[in-house]
């Protein structure tokens, strides 16, 4: 198990990107959350099997066809026990 925080930069708000993030995380059996930041970026915390998290990051970099990701800043975090789902925070 591994957990990352990520700040995603680019055209990532107002284009269905958080929903795309949530769907991608659920398909890969990952937990965590994502939310829009006031500066136009999206913040993500994601946790799961390392290969699945790496696949998630790869998919997020590609975007959903409407979003345009210019950069992702990743940092490793301690794993959270008991987290059961991936949610969108508002």
Swiss-Prot record:
Record InterPro entries: Acylphosphatase, Acylphosphatase-like_dom, Acylphosphatase-like_dom_sf, Acylphosphatase_CS
Cross-referenced SUPFAM superfamilies: Acylphosphatase/BLUF domain-like
Coiled coil: none
Record domain Acylphosphatase-like: where: 3-90
Any one Gene Ontology molecular-function term assigned to this protein's record: acylphosphatase activity
Keywords: Hydrolase
Pfam families hit by this protein: Acylphosphatase (PF00708)
EC class of the enzyme, as a word: hydrolase
Catalytic activity line of the entry: an acyl phosphate + H2O = a carboxylate + phosphate + H(+)
This enzyme's EC code(s): 3.6.1.7
Superkingdom of origin: Bacteria
Active site, per annotation: 18, 36
Hydrolase found in the keyword field: yes
PANTHER family in the record: ACYLPHOSPHATASE (PTHR47268:SF4)
Family as reported in the entry's similarity comment: Belongs to the acylphosphatase family.
Protein name per Swiss-Prot or TrEMBL: Acylphosphatase
Native source species: Clostridium beijerinckii (strain ATCC 51743 / NCIMB 8052)
